[in-house]
């Protein structure tokens, strides 16, 4: 999965898909009352990027629905996964559950079209801090209680906090998410800084272990060709980048070509790939 990073303006959906992305990452800014409001990252962000592009969240979800609905004039068949990076800086911990419900309501209405011929992309909820696990609980509860349980098949989960994997595992348990139940484990840092592959390799080992909790692993934000190659060789399933074309064009040795290809829609993002 090539994940186009910080796609927060509607026009950027096409821009990043044209560059080779089959997935995008979008920032979702919440109000202090736990309402999803905008697609917005803000300052600081990655080096060499403009940090302040934004859209109203409902309008963005509707544009995203069109981009991922077969038969629509805006349809982009390549776009199969959307990572929602949830910005919770202004949300009280006590409001995390309601924030999850609010996000679920907006996705049902504006992306899934009330469950009728909505967008087909898989949705990965990326929660920045483990202690906000009740956002996931509220999100899942809304879909189950309002008759949209089937849509959970399209939803996965990630805690992006840079902490012990055991702490993240506990977060999923607290949220009611079983081991290997649509879980991605992320690792990374802003492209402004260098980072070793130590934690990424630990996450890959967890994914491949019989008693691990995750299905997939992605690495962010990777722009240098050497770093892209290193992350692929380390076993990452997804590469989050500001330059999808670099991932497409990075030199690949025969061993990489045997093991990896660009993901397609029929490839289940919740299933661990056995090499």
UniProtKB/Swiss-Prot annotation:
Residues noted as binding Mg(2+) in the record, renumbered to the chain: 25, 27, 85
Disulfide bonds: 45-51, 47-192
Gene3D superfamilies hit by this protein: Phosphatidylinositol (PI) phosphodiesterase
Active site residues per record: 5, 41
Function according to Swiss-Prot or TrEMBL: Dermonecrotic toxins cleave the phosphodiester linkage between the phosphate and headgroup of certain phospholipids (sphingolipid and lysolipid substrates), forming an alcohol (often choline) and a cyclic phosphate. This toxin acts on sphingomyelin (SM). It may also act on ceramide phosphoethanolamine (CPE), lysophosphatidylcholine (LPC) and lysophosphatidylethanolamine (LPE), but not on lysophosphatidylserine (LPS), and lysophosphatidylglycerol (LPG). It acts by transphosphatidylation, releasing exclusively cyclic phosphate products as second products.
Similarity section: Belongs to the arthropod phospholipase D family. Class II subfamily.
Entry protein name: Dermonecrotic toxin LhSicTox-alphaVI1i
């Amino acid at each position: 999965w090539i994940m186009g990073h910080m796609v927060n303006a509607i026009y950027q959906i096409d821009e990043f898909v044209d560059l080779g992305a089959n997935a995008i990452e979008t920032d979702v800014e919440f109000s202090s009352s736990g309402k999803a409001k905008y697609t917005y990252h803000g300052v600081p962000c990655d080096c060499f990027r403009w940090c302040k592009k934004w859209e109203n969240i409902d309008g963005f979800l509707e544009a995203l629905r069109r981009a991922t609905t077969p038969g629509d004039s805006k349809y982009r068949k390549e776009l199969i996964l959307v990572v929602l990076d949830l910005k919770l800086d202004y949300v009280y911990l006590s409001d995390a559950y309601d924030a999850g419900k609010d996000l679920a309501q907006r996705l049902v209405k504006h992306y899934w079209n009330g469950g009728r011929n909505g967008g087909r992309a898989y949705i990965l909820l990326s929660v920045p801090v483990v202690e906000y696990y009740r956002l996931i609980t509220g999100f899942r509860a809304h879909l189950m209680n309002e008759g949209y349980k089937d849509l959970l098949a399209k939803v996965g989960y990630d805690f992006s906090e840079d902490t012990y994997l055991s702490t993240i595992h506990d977060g999923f348990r607290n949220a009611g998410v079983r081991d290997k139940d649509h879980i991605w484990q992320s690792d990374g840092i802003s492209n402004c800084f260098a980072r070793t592959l130590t934690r990424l390799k630990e996450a890959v080992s967890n994914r491949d272990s019989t008693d691990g909790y995750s299905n997939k692993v992605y690495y962010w934000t990777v722009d240098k060709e050497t770093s892209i190659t290193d992350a692929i060789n380390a076993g990452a399933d997804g590469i989050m980048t500001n330059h999808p074309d670099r991932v497409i064009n990075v030199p690949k040795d025969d061993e990489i070509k045997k093991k990896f290809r660009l993901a397609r829609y029929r490839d289940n993002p919740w299933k661990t790939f056995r090499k």
